């Protein structure tokens, strides 16, 4: 479970261009929910997602993940917790174009502290690619894929470590409506397997397929 209490995020702190992106955001995300974070451009959606995913730190407030306070953790502990519990899907896919699908999805396992033989790692990679319908392309380089296929690979990489918490930043933003529908079906299946899924989106059709919506405007949660 995720608990956010009065989260404040300030960019360029102490400088002339100081900017407070989040103004006391409080929210609770229960295990197994599929949630959309919506709002206008610049409202603070991605900032909040980056805080949830340990990509960015907050300046005030409290973030508790599965009973563990995040704020006082050092970078090493945060990296370990992120690798074990959180899967992150970035807006630009963040895949290595010249790598094969298999080698891209393998990366989180190579950084994991879980002791696994190479065969077990490869089995996990194949299972993750199969879950998103990309197993048959595992030896193909990413640069040969369409946008929708790349998104599927990004999802496979995010779930290969078996995280309980999946975060996605505008995962359908560059996709057509048909591909968006296919990707949302993948997220739905992942959620039905018991994972918590949080999707930042500006697409109402995506938000409508989630169980709950958190709306952010001007750095605050609005009802």
Which ranges hold each PLM region?
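Catalytic Walker B motif of ABC-type/P-loop ATPase nucleotide-binding domains
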Residues: 166-169
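Helix-to-loop junction immediately C-terminal to a conserved catalytic motif
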Residues: 53
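Conserved ABC ATPase signature
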Residues: 141-145, 149
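A short, proline-enriched helix->beta-strand linker immediately N-terminal to the Walker B motif
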Residues: 160-164
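Conserved ABC transporter NBD signature motif
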Residues: 61-69
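ABC nucleotide-binding domain "signature" region
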Residues: 120-132
């Amino acid at each position: 479970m995720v608990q956010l209490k009065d989260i404040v995020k300030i960019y360029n702190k102490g400088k002339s261009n100081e900017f407070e992106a989040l103004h006391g955001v409080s929210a609770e995300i229960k295990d197994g929910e599929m949630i959309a974070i919506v709002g206008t451009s610049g409202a603070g959606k991605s900032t909040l997602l980056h805080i949830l995913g340990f990509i960015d730190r907050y300046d005030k407030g409290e973030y508790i993940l599965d009973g563990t306070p995040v704020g006082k953790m050092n970078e090493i502990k945060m990296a370990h917790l992120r690798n074990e519990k959180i899967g992150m899907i970035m807006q630009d896919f963040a895949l290595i174009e010249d790598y094969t699908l298999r080698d891209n999805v393998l990366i989180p396992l190579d950084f994991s502290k879980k002791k696994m033989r190479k065969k077990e790692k490869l089995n996990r990679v194949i299972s993750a690619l199969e879950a998103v319908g990309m197993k048959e392309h595992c030896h193909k380089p990413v640069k040969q894929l369409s946008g929708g296929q790349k998104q599927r690979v990004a999802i496979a990489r995010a779930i290969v470590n078996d995280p309980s918490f999946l975060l996605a930043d505008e995962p359908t933003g560059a996709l057509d409506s048909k591909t968006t529908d296919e990707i949302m079906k993948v997220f739905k299946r992942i959620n039905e397997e018991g994972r918590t899924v949080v999707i930042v989106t500006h697409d109402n059709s995506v938000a409508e397929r989630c169980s709950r919506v958190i709306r952010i405007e001007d750095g605050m949660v609005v009802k």
